[in-house]
From Swiss-Prot:
CDD domains the UniProt entry points to: M14_CP_A-B_like
Record-linked InterPro entries: M14A-like_propep, M14A_act_pep, Peptidase_M14
GO BP annotation list: proteolysis
Highest taxon, organism lineage: Eukaryota
Chain ranges of the Peptidase M14 domain: 119-419
Protein name as it appears in the record: Metallocarboxypeptidase A
Length: 422
């Protein structure tokens, strides 16, 4: 199976900050094929034989195959899957991307409000927005340049605290956009930052949360990959770090954490979307994030870590590396996951599934959740797959940003209230 990442090699083969012509997805279709016992092997063969990219690969029966089909292969693909049920996710992927990437201009110094969340934005505008947002609440927050990416971009963070003062409470850490193409996670983590700051002393639940925790929000964990999705290839997933003796750049940063690094839940192939890297923790951005998490943990410890992804509408607990092992805190993780999902659904009716990562989505090696729990000894370590379940997938329309933020905030507030209550 050809990786989505390999498409970008048509546009760029080196890791630089230079602007590259965007890969054109005009005429590409994204088609979902639900699998079952009698067709899963054939769907896998079609993907392999036609060398097709997937957003979701069906590793076993019952899993959906979300397949990217170029114009030149549509006839062959439709012939091979004749008689199978299909769902059209994107009739013209290029058109969907053009609609999604109609960014609204942002003027630095603007007082941030709900209008920010009516559009997606450029990487540089995100930096301006975060600094402007923090500037409105200087006594209860700080904007932090957490470190530099491989290409030298800022990895931004917002640090938020309440009545006890900075670094006086156990920390909550949220990560977004570790996978470059998951734009909704950037916006949703920023929506939560905006809410925690603007609703403090206005909303009792949010005030209690901010008073009880030191909150760290990293909306763009993978800035090089994120910027690349905006200039060159919308579907890029990995970072942009070169791989020696390999034509394919990039590591999957969520397979690069130095815990349970090797296994079937990651790949040793540099051209794979799930390439784990040459060594555990050798991703430039992973080194930055591990250093930051250790520094945060050295204060009052880390009460909770959540890594926000898309898509799938899932809220998951450890482990990723094993489908049979369970942490001693499994029951608590499951309880909080259900609380999150129930509160989220109450807002817009959006259903989320919950459960351990390996059993709920797929096996994952070298991931952030397992590392945080087992190496950093974070008390509660979780991950989410935000909207949707595949109707639009990674290319989620901008009109879903605000409802995604509203429901995710509600789930998060309910979950953190339960943590405070014990």
């Amino acid at each position: 199976m050809r990786s989505v990442l390999s498409l970008a090699l048509l546009a760029a083969n080196v890791v630089t900050a230079a602007v590259v012509s965007p890969f054109d997805y005009s005429g590409y279709k994204v088609i979902r094929v639900p699998t079952q016992k009698d067709n899963v092997k054939e769907v896998q063969r079609v993907i392999t034989d036609l060398n097709l990219d997937t957003w979701k690969y069906p590793k076993s029966e019952g899993q959906n195959a979300d397949i990217v089909v170029p114009p030149s292969q549509i006839s062959s693909f439709m012939e091979r899957i004749s008689g199978m049920n299909i769902e059209m996710m994107h009739e013209d992927l290029g058109l969907s991307i053009r609609n999604e990437t109609s960014f609204e201009a942002y003027s630095a110094g603007y007082a941030p409000d709900i209008n920010w969340f009516k559009s997606y934005h450029s990487y540089q505008d995100h930096l301006s927005y975060l600094q402007d947002l923090q500037g409105l609440f200087r006594t209860r927050s700080e904007y932090v340049d957490a470190g530099k990416s491989h290409e030298g971009r800022t990895i931004p963070a917002l640090h938020i605290w309440g009545s006890g003062g900075k670094n006086s409470k156990p920390a909550i850490i949220f990560h977004g956009t570790i996978h470059a193409r998951e734009w909704i996670t950037t916006m949703v983590t920023e929506y939560m930052a905006w809410s925690f700051l603007s609703q403090y002393n206005k909303n009792a639940d949010i005030t209690s949360i901010v008073d009880n925790f030191d909150i760290w929000i990293f909306p763009i964990v993978n800035p090089d990959g994120f910027a690349f999705t905006q200039t060159s290839n919308r579907l890029w997933r990995k970072n942009r770090q070169p791989n020696p003796n390999a034509r394919c750049p990039g590591r999957d940063l969520n397979r690069n954490y130095p815990y349970q690094w090797v296994g079937p839940g990651s790949s040793s192939n540099p051209c794979s979307d799930t390439y784990r890297g040459a060594q555990p923790g050798d991703g430039t951005e992973i080194k930055v994030h591990i250093a930051n998490m250790k520094k945060i943990a050295a204060n009052k410890g880390i009460a909770m870590f959540v890594d926000w992804h898309s898509y799938g509408q899932l809220f998951m607990s450890p482990y990723g590396y094993s489908c049979t092992a369970r942490p001693p805190t499994d029951a608590r993780h499951q309880e909080l996951s259900r609380i999150f999902a129930q509160a989220l659904k109450a807002v817009h009716g959006t259903p989320y599934k919950t459960g351990p990562i390996c059993n709920t989505i797929y096996q994952v090696n070298g991931d952030s959740v397992d590392y945080a729990l087992e190496v950093l000894k974070v008390k509660l370590s979780l991950t989410a797959e935000l909207r949707d379940t595949g109707a639009r997938g990674f290319v989620l329309p901008a009109d879903q940003i605000i409802p995604s933020g509203e429901e995710t905030l509600a789930g998060t507030v309910a979950m953190l209230k339960a943590v405070i209550q014990g």
